[in-house]
Amino acid sequence: MKPAKEIRVGNIIMVDSKPMIVLRSDVNGSSRTGFTYKWKMKNLLTNTPMENVFRGDDKFDVVVLDKKPVTYSYFADPLYVFMDEEYNQYEIEEENLGDALHYLKDGMECEAVFYDGKAISVELPITIARQVVYSEPAVKGNTSGNVLKEAKIENAVEAHRHTVQVPLFVSQDDVIEIDTRTNEYKRVVRN
């Protein structure tokens, strides 16, 4: 058990018998009156957000989640199916995947996150390479400063086709590297 004052953003704790990830932490108070911690959290099982205020000496169980390398296999409406190297299949609900939906591609390797023996989400590699499937051509004379345009990238599910801001020189069919944490263009990948 850890006191609230030792819990950091990104820690997974049990609140009312539910696993919650701490997304943001604001501290108020003084050493004389005692500190309070206002946390913005997300339930790992239902993806519902929650905000709550705790005293610095409130204690919480810290949860360590299991992770296992898996490969994205297919979409079986409304579940996404992943397979490990032993051909075990894990089904994850669409709402639990979050932004990972934008980058999933058949055969993509990632890590499944398990809580209590059940796959609850996936973690993607930090950077991935994706082909640009549509991008407006650059307009001549539109080159002053850091000018960006939208580019649609390939992924497994057409309904979740995603756009990324890219420089003007990026064109359709280019392969670009993207940071999955920030959804930012990194560079053009040369083959």
UniProtKB/Swiss-Prot annotation:
Keywords: Cytoplasm, Elongation factor, Protein biosynthesis. It comes from the Bacteria. GO terms for cellular component: cytoplasm. GO terms for biological process: peptide biosynthetic process. SUPFAM superfamilies: Nucleic acid-binding proteins, Translation proteins SH3-like domain. Pathway: Protein biosynthesis; polypeptide chain elongation. The keyword Protein biosynthesis applies. One of its GO terms (molecular function) is translation elongation factor activity. SMART domains: EFP, Elong-fact-P_C. It is found in: Cytoplasm. It holds the Pfam family Elong-fact-P_C. Belongs to the elongation factor P family. Involved in peptide bond synthesis. Stimulates efficient translation and peptide-bond synthesis on native or reconstituted 70S ribosomes in vitro. Probably functions indirectly by altering the affinity of the ribosome for aminoacyl-tRNA, thus increasing their reactivity as acceptors for peptidyl transferase. This is Elongation factor P. It comes from Janthinobacterium sp. (strain Marseille) (Minibacterium massiliensis). The lineage of its organism: Bacteria, Pseudomonadati, Pseudomonadota, Betaproteobacteria, Burkholderiales.
